């Protein structure tokens, strides 16, 4: 399972969302910078904090032209309860096949119980990886302030086609 590096195209993942419509990443995010978050599960306090942080920063992220999507192996009911609890407005996927997602993205998988370890990607508007953050445990993850700063930097210092 190779890791995704800057410049690599993000693989196509079709995810079921609690909103009812499946989405295909990165196609559904094309044209904007995007953050793709794999979180361990609703039971993880660090994941809850990260998701809340991205929700709190939603206006700043939107103003910077950054979209967010998150997913985990949790079932629909657990995922919907998490989204409701934190009033998450970005798409949240559920029921991810940890082995398939790991094979496509290089994310680490906890063997028992099976779940994806925290992994985050920043994608450019063409669906290529700008930054990948892999964690083999509870800590080490993207934060919205860093993402906004990175995208602002890229827009200011890149060729017009990349902005």
Where do the model's predicted regions map?
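Chalcogenol-based redox active-site neighborhoods
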Residues: 1-163
């Amino acid at each position: 399972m190779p890791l995704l590096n800057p410049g690599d195209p993000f693989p196509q993942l079709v995810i079921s969302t609690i909103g009812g419509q499946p989405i295909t990443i990165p196609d559904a995010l094309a044209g904007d910078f995007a953050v793709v978050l794999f979180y361990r599960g609703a039971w993880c306090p660090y994941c809850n904090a990260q998701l809340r942080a991205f929700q709190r920063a939603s206006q700043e992220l939107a103003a910077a032209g950054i979209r967010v999507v998150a997913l985990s192996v949790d079932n629909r009911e657990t995922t919907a309860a998490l989204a409701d609890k934190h009033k998450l407005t970005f798409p949240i996927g559920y029921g991810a096949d940890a082995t398939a997602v790991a094979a496509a993205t290089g994310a680490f998988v906890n063997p028992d119980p099976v779940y994806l370890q925290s992994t985050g990607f920043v994608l450019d508007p063409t669906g290529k990886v700008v930054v990948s953050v892999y964690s083999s445990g509870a800590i080490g993850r993207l934060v919205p302030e860093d993402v906004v700063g990175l995208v602002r930097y890229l827009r200011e210092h890149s060729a017009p086609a990349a902005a």
